[in-house]
Swiss-Prot record:
Catalyzes the dephosphorylation of undecaprenyl diphosphate (UPP). Confers resistance to bacitracin. GO terms for molecular function: undecaprenyl-diphosphatase activity. Its EC number is 3.6.1.27. It is found in: Cell inner membrane. It holds the Pfam family BacA. The keyword Cell membrane applies. The chain crosses the membrane at residues 38-58, 75-95, 106-126, 136-156, 181-201, 217-237, 242-262. This is Undecaprenyl-diphosphatase. Coiled coil: none annotated. Keywords: Antibiotic resistance, Cell inner membrane, Cell membrane, Cell shape, Cell wall biogenesis/degradation, Hydrolase, Membrane, Peptidoglycan synthesis, Transmembrane, Transmembrane helix. GO terms for cellular component: plasma membrane.
Length: 264
């Protein structure tokens, strides 16, 4: 398989999995066992490509928040987005400076998929007994920020799954409202992560080793695919639970543990 085709497939995979609660990083780590390992910069860039999709899907909401910033409700929502981002940025930077790196084996990803799937089922069962609430509290905002860090530390957890379900558990029980807040927080989070990694690699003189054609193709593939997925998901969760995704995670994690040799 050519490197360009491999990059295209990884971009499509990122777009498909970044916003579904099934872990994009986990799927990319698994896929790279067969499609070839890529740099951290490549992975961050295609994640940023997927975030472009969020900007396009929620462009009207973003415009509303910007033009209506003088209104208390919009202003508080923006401040809570900022708080969630700052928590992720500060705690994430501490974790990064501590030298934490992603595991190179699939087994931890498999376990994270299984545990995350069970967590999703439990939260769905609990919140089903609660009235629908769409108010983002400060507790929800801080929780979402911390959940994003956890997802970054443990691939297979899923940023969207950990953040959306913690938001639901903390009181933002309406799925669409929780997903919207998490996706909007993802915009500055992933763009900041991309910029940080870019500057680090530039200082180290490592950018010359990247194939920019492959990076560009993967970025566009992730953006286009992500746009379609986000539009579909926001409609789907208005009338469906996340149960199907939870069962998929458990099945995939179990299959990986059964089929992959130990140490993989």
């Amino acid at each position: 398989m050519s490197d360009l085709l491999s990059a295209l497939l990884l971009g499509i995979l990122e777009g498909l999995t970044e916003f579904l609660p099934i872990s994009s990083t986990g799927h990319l780590l698994i896929a790279q066992h067969w499609l070839g390992a890529r740099s951290d910069f490549f992975n961050i860039v295609i994640q940023a490509g997927a975030i472009v999709a969020v900007v396009l899907v929620f462009r009207q909401r973003l415009l509303q928040l910007a033009t209506g910033f003088g209104q208390r409700e919009n202003r508080e929502y923006v401040f809570k987005l900022g708080a969630a981002f700052l928590v992720t940025a500060v705690v994430g930077l501490v974790v990064r400076k501590a030298g934490w790196s992603l595991p190179e084996t699939v087994s931890p990803v498999a376990w994270a998929l299984i545990i995350g799937g069970i967590w999703m089922l439990l939260v769905e069962a609990y919140t089903a007994r609660l009235p629908d609430r769409d108010q983002v509290t400060w507790t929800v905002a801080i929780g979402v920020g911390l959940a994003q860090v956890v997802a970054g530390v443990f691939p297979g957890t899923s940023r969207s799954a950990s953040a959306i379900f913690l938001a639901m558990l903390l009181g933002l029980s309406r799925r669409a409202a929780a997903a919207e807040f998490v996706f909007l927080v993802g915009i500055p989070t992933m763009f900041a992560a991309s910029a940080y990694t870019f500057l680090e690699m530039a200082k180290a003189g490592q950018l010359g080793s990247e194939n920019w054609t492959e990076v560009g193709v993967a970025f566009l593939a992730a953006a286009v695919t992500g746009f379609v997925v986000v539009k579909w998901l926001m409609g789907y969760i208005k009338s469906h639970k996340f149960t199907a995704f939870a069962l998929y995670r458990i099945a995939l994690g179990a299959a990986l543990l059964l089929w992959l040799p130990s140490g993989s």
